């Protein structure tokens, strides 16, 4: 029941993900951070098999650090996305990773950007996206409510609406979520959402209209 959400706003990008580590019917932990800070201005939200997810995101992170160490300059977000896509495509023909990625970053020359890369190395630059079962509900909400000029508060509010809809619609919904942001100030954690009560009785009027 993994859920990863990404949104690009006005000179920033937001990536959110659930924090549940689940296998079959068991919940192993509820504080698993699935949004990795790759470097000072890049975030990678990932879903998929836990072992593949952890190994692949750490592999990308260490290679970015190695490139910067050797060349004294960081990779751009676009270059990082192409490198990530290339590694998934190469592994697909050998020992594939079952990992889906939303890569967000900020570059001084182009601003914030978000890239969609799935486990078969499909690659797109997008403004909004989601992976996991939650994407069935988030994508319709974002189609209705998303605007390219959103402020940070508006983007986080949209993410919160997506989370509420996920918790309303999924039979077994994640309880905890983490939200991170990247902008000219860098990549950092913005907020956490923890729900210990029962799922909401109804979504917001906008969410209910879209999901109906």
Curated annotation (Swiss-Prot):
Cell location: Cytoplasm; Nucleus
One GO CC term, this protein: cytosol
Main location: cytoplasm
Record key words, sorted: Cytoplasm, Nucleus, Proteasome
Xref: Gene3D superfamilies: Glutamine Phosphoribosylpyrophosphate, subunit 1, domain 1
Any GO BP annotation: proteasome-mediated ubiquitin-dependent protein catabolic process
PROSITE patterns named in the record: PROTEASOME_BETA_1, PROTEASOME_BETA_2
InterPro entries xref list: Ntn_hydrolases_N (IPR029055), Proteasome_alpha (IPR050115), Proteasome_beta2 (IPR035206), Proteasome_bsu_CS (IPR016050), Proteasome_sua/b (IPR001353), Proteasome_suB-type (IPR023333)
CDD domains linked: proteasome_beta_type_2
Family: Belongs to the peptidase T1B family.
Summary of subunit composition and partner proteins: The 26S proteasome consists of a 20S proteasome core and two 19S regulatory subunits. The 20S proteasome core is composed of 28 subunits that are arranged in four stacked rings, resulting in a barrel-shaped structure. The two end rings are each formed by seven alpha subunits, and the two central rings are each formed by seven beta subunits. The catalytic chamber with the active sites is on the inside of the barrel.
Function (record text): Non-catalytic component of the proteasome, a multicatalytic proteinase complex which is characterized by its ability to cleave peptides with Arg, Phe, Tyr, Leu, and Glu adjacent to the leaving group at neutral or slightly basic pH. The proteasome has an ATP-dependent proteolytic activity.
Name of this protein: Proteasome subunit beta type-2
Organism lineage: Eukaryota, Viridiplantae, Streptophyta, Embryophyta, Tracheophyta
The encoding gene: PBD1
